[in-house]
């Protein structure tokens, strides 16, 4: 009897998800002659017992070829709602679908929820990491991160010239509430002067002094500041009320920093803020994300064939390997190492990356 496996995408979208789907459908069909069913809109589709045959409905082996360069996910996804409030219904729905295994593509949050459901229902689960934040533990790669970095670098390339033309400080706010990998990688690669991330606190005085030094010592009248949305002020600044109402995470970090630079310079420094927002989640997947997604999808199918469940496909030392999902969940989110090579390299290049401890 042919195996029947399901696949779903969960959490925020990112480039490369369709590449994973393409690899799973191709390998499962060509190599193992299995049936592959897509679960639309993650746990919502699971709850509603929806399953789309991915070797039919236009997504057969010929139909999945365009997925290689498509952003987003053809299956749809959700990143809201209290899934664990419907555990019993979810478990019953999974049983009704009669799947031999389920391949899930998600970030640290959605993987934790799906692992919990799988543990309660004894599901045959295999996971694939995707995140533009690169904060999933135990893997050196995750689908979507490389494209997001390239998207930010492209924006920095464009904004640098307009900043230089007007002698402005250009502040670029990027995603990263709890981990600063995206800001750090893109900031270094994009030639930023300042990179502010959640893991290393900064001071307004230190930031303003650095920008003043660029102007006075190096005759640089423009600057590029990359700030993660979760960048944190030093505790002393918060306690002294320097941050005012903008200490709240609801206040945009980029706008707050622009206001503080204007205050410190007595409005002599012209600032502009660009919040990249969901542009970072879109776009055509990079070559590296396509390769990562393809290898991850193929490996996930092989793990199902080998009966190795409760595993996430990870990239370590140049190879795709299985690691226990429970270990990934326990160690996520993965934070930037403040003493790591990237932070040290940034500082050696003269980039302000917050205060040294």
From Swiss-Prot:
Which superkingdom heads the taxonomic lineage of this protein's source? Bacteria
Taking the first listed entry, what is the main subcellular location of this protein, grouped into a coarse class? cytoplasm
According to its UniProt entry, the protein's GO biological process terms are: canonical glycolysis; fructose 1,6-bisphosphate metabolic process; fructose 6-phosphate metabolic process
- Site for Important for substrate specificity, residues: 109
Cite a single GO MF annotation.
identical protein binding
Cofactor section: Mg(2+)
What EC number(s) would the UniProt record show? 2.7.1.11
**Active-site residues from the entry:** 133 (proton acceptor)
* Pfam families, A to Z: PFK (PF00365)
If you read the UniProt record, what top EC class would you report for this enzyme, in one word? transferase
HAMAP family, alphabetized: Phosphofructokinase_III
Function of the protein: Catalyzes the phosphorylation of D-fructose 6-phosphate to fructose 1,6-bisphosphate by ATP, the first committing step of glycolysis.
| Protein name, entry field | ATP-dependent 6-phosphofructokinase
Source species: Trichormus variabilis (strain ATCC 29413 / PCC 7937) (Anabaena variabilis)
Taxonomy of the source species: Bacteria, Bacillati, Cyanobacteriota, Cyanophyceae, Nostocales
